Structure formats: structure tokens, C-alpha cells
Amino acid sequence: AMAKAIEDAIAALQYKDADYTKVDAAIAKANALNKNDYKDFSGVEAAVNAVVRDKNITEQSEVDAMAKAIEDAIAALQYKDADYTKVDAAIAKANALNKNDYKDFSGVEAAVNAVVRDKNITEQSEVDAMAKAIEDAIAALQYKDADYTKVDAAIAKANALNKDNYKDFTGVEAAVNAVTRGKNLTEQTEVDAMAKAIEDAIAALQYKDADYTKVDAAIAKAN
């Protein structure tokens, strides 16, 4: 009977529970992550779902393996790529411009060349800054000045004329006074129109009639 009592006591013994501290820590680590930041989070979820509770101390190595599986899955995660949509749009905008229209296009080129690809989603703010740098450089561009060569030539032509020789010189003066400086390259047609207005006004000039007073007097005297 005594032997049976010992047998029963041994049979009633229960192993201590295995230590799940590492497992719980790994799960907490996994839960703290934003699954949407990663290309594929399924490995982590599978490792967490594979955890079996109620293992005892003789099975500690299995429990530790569960923790390691979660940690390994977390370590293998890859962030999604950053979104370069704004960068690509800004580059397309820059490429659509004619660099020769601007006084200095180097700022735009520098901003485009400073773009670094392959940033991940955690670096999105850097990528957005690249896009903004290009947009800012485009916004800061200044057109080259319009070419006033024809205008200046027409004005010089007008200034060389003796206004007293013409019946009405006001059209020429008005055309010269209508010249507006400071136009840029995109307004060249307006500048060319100023030159044409002066040229047209000069072409429309009419000389005053010659003075025949002395001739008439001489004829009268002869008669």
C-alpha cells in the first residue's frame, strides 16, 4: 500500500509551466508594427498563430523556437517602397519646359539630379521633400527677357527723322511712347508688334507740301 501511495504521488506530479516570456515579448513586438507598412506581413502572422500555449518546462525548447520564429519573421520584413508619384510628376513638369526660355535653369536640373530612388515608406517625407525641391525650383524660374532689337531699331529710325518735314508726326510719337519695356520671352510677339507699330507709323508719314510762295512771286513778277 505504501508503494502504491508513492506511485500515486509520483503520478500526480505536474511539471512547471514553460516560460513564455520571450513568446509574449515577440508577439507584443509584432502587434506594435503597422502591417500596412510592409510588403508582406503574412510570415509574422503565421508565426504568431503557430504559438501553442500550455507547454511545460520539458518543452521549453519548443516554446523558445516559437519565439524565435516570430522574431525571425519580423527581422525578414521588408518595408513597402515609398511613393514617388509626386517626384515623377515634378520631373515630368521640369522635362516639359524649354530650358533655353529661362535665365537660369540650373536649379531645376540640380533638384532633379538630387532625386534618390529606392527609398522605403518610412522615408516618405524625404521623398516628398525631393518633389517639393523640384516644384520650388520650377516656381523660382525667370523667363529670359524679350528681344527689343527691332523696337530699338525702329525708335532710332524715328528719332533720325525731322518731324517738321511731315504733315503729322503724332502717329510715330504715339507708337514710340506706347513701347513697354521689361517684357519677357513669352511676350515676344507683343514686343514685335510694338516695333511694327512704329515702322507702320513711319511708313504712313506724309511730307508737307513744298512752299511755292517764292516761285509764285517770281512768276507774278515775270508777268
Task: Please identify what each model-predicted range represents.
Residues A1-N223:
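Beta-rich interaction/scaffold domains
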